[in-house]
Amino acid sequence: MRITYPSIDKLLSRVDSRYSLSVLAAKRAHELEAGDPPTLEHFKCDKAVGKALEEIAAGKVTVDPAHAEVNLED
C-alpha cells in the first residue's frame, strides 16, 4: 500500500517515527471503527485508517507520551 494523501512527510512532521505513526494510526482507526466520533467534519478517505491518517495530518490526533508503554527486557 502506498500513502499518497496525506503525504508521509506531513505525517512524519507530526509524529517522531514511522513506527509511532503506524501504531497511532492503527489505534485511532480501531477507535473510529468502534464508534468514537471523528475529529474532522469531512474526509477524502472512506476507510478508517485513511481517516485516522487525515486526523493525524491535521494535528487533531497526537501521541500522549504520558501513556506510552515501554517494556524492556534484561
From Swiss-Prot:
Any single GO BP term: DNA-templated transcription
Keywords: DNA-directed RNA polymerase, Nucleotidyltransferase, Transcription, Transferase
Reactions catalysed, as given in the entry: RNA(n) + a ribonucleoside 5'-triphosphate = RNA(n+1) + diphosphate
Broad class of enzyme this protein falls into: transferase
Gene3D superfamilies the UniProt entry points to: 3.90.940.10
Record InterPro entries: DNA-dir_RNA_pol_omega, Pol_omega/Rpo6/RPB6, RPB6/omega-like_sf
Chain segments annotated as coiled-coil in the UniProt record: none
Database matches in Pfam families: RNA_pol_Rpb6 (PF01192)
The UniProt record lists the keyword Metal-binding: no
HAMAP family xrefs: RNApol_bact_RpoZ (MF_00366)
Quaternary assembly: The RNAP catalytic core consists of 2 alpha, 1 beta, 1 beta' and 1 omega subunit. When a sigma factor is associated with the core the holoenzyme is formed, which can initiate transcription.
Job description of the protein: Promotes RNA polymerase assembly. Latches the N- and C-terminal regions of the beta' subunit thereby facilitating its interaction with the beta and alpha subunits.
Family the entry assigns: Belongs to the RNA polymerase subunit omega family.
Protein name per Swiss-Prot or TrEMBL: DNA-directed RNA polymerase subunit omega
Organism (species): Lactobacillus acidophilus (strain ATCC 700396 / NCK56 / N2 / NCFM)
